[in-house]
Amino acid sequence: TSEEGDLFWNQLDFQANPIGRINRKFDSGDFYSPGEWSSIVDEELQEPTPLELQIHTDIINYPDSVHLNVHVFGQYFSSKVSGNHRLSILFSESHLIGDQLDYSQDPEHVYDYEFNHLLRGSLTGAEGLTVIENPNSGDTFQSDFTYDWNSDWAINNCQIIAVVSDENGYIINCLGQYIIE
């Protein structure tokens, strides 16, 4: 687990595995079962976004460490969104094998489960940092970070995810990409 993952988990109104959150649209505690995911995600993907995001990363290898420079640029194409907008920079890792508790299985433990897109941590904290207030069409922001890479994470299997949300947690747009492509 991670601090960020624990925060997201504790926001749920009901906790069980597997379970998913999709955009915190109505309430941050809303949850959906796997059978609901596909149709709800399809609906969300049809929503127009007022914000375009770009991520650029540079990896700097030192003898004893790796530094990651992260640059996120956002541009608004609508004035229909207001309030404080927060940028969260999250890291996920895929192809991890381990024990997964799944109440729908018998036995409930799947010991050789392959985890993909497992939340590992963040640059900004789970809820992010305010990057712009009351944006108008044409407004932009740029945020730059340097991160000392956690050597326990396989960088070749990791993604960086930029999430911009409003002050209620509703996700305005997000973008993810592998750190090494």
Identify what each model region corresponds to.
Residues 1-181:
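Short, conserved sequence motifs used for protein processing/export or organelle targeting and
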